[in-house]
Amino acid sequence: MEPDDFDGGWDNRVTLVDGRWVDRTPRFPDREPQLRREAALLPWLGPLLPLPVPAPTVVSEDPFTVRHAYLPGSRCPGTSPEHGAEIGRFLRTLHTVDTGEAIRHGARDGDTTYAEVQTTVARMAREVLPLLPARVAASGEALLERMATPPPRTSVVHADLGPEHIRVVAERVTGVIDWGDSGIGDPALDLAWTTLGADRPFADAVLLGYRPDEALVARARDWHQLGPWHEVLYGLGEGGREFVESGLAGTVDRLERFGSS
């Protein structure tokens, strides 16, 4: 995401105001609760973390809009060990935040997030699995079965930590944005792109800073494989055929690379 590419997200319309503020309005009514959660949670959570995050406030109810200070930077390329080291430390801190306090400040509880995951996995089994070529169908089915198992532990998670949500300037990480999917969930989800989708220098630095055990790494691998399935679902809904085709290509690629790991 380039610094001025503010309106490319799936969930919200995003506008830069006076070069200082970011306004976000949901594209669809069912996205509004995400922004309300951010406005409740992030002003409390932000001071506990080692990297900047937005601190949104509600500035309009019709249309519903939140505003926060602009965090300068561009999309993280996922190549720099300096960036990776900062993200590893950030995630280690995030995943030790008190979950009870987070829930009291607006975070979704673990039962809610797990139920949402299971609803999504069931939909993937119905709508995406039949679209997969035969050579990866068994791996896809096994992946969905593993994801139906509750995580061994839960923590506060960002839950959508890809390169477009990490802002960087030169070798500094200047912010972690877009917390609409956050809640109490599987910490391995935050390690999916950061340790498997990024380039090795970045990923290795994340692992060094975070120090996950093998079970967490394996769970992160499963989350990484599941990522493109969401793109297929989005395409089958409002996104259109281009997202279906791109998501299926990504799903097949990841199942072939990681499915037998």
Kindly label every feature range from the protein language model:
Residues 47-51, 131, 213-214:
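Short helix-capping segments at alpha-helix termini
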Residues 38, 42, 118-122, 188, ...:
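A general structural signal for well-ordered alpha-helical segments in protein cores
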Residues 2-112, 151:
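ATP-binding pocket architecture of kinase catalytic cores
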Residues 7-17, 23, 142-191:
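Active-site acidic catalytic loop and adjacent metal/ATP-binding pocket
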Residues 11, 30, 76, 184, ...:
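Helix-rich C-terminal or lid/interface subdomains of diverse kinases
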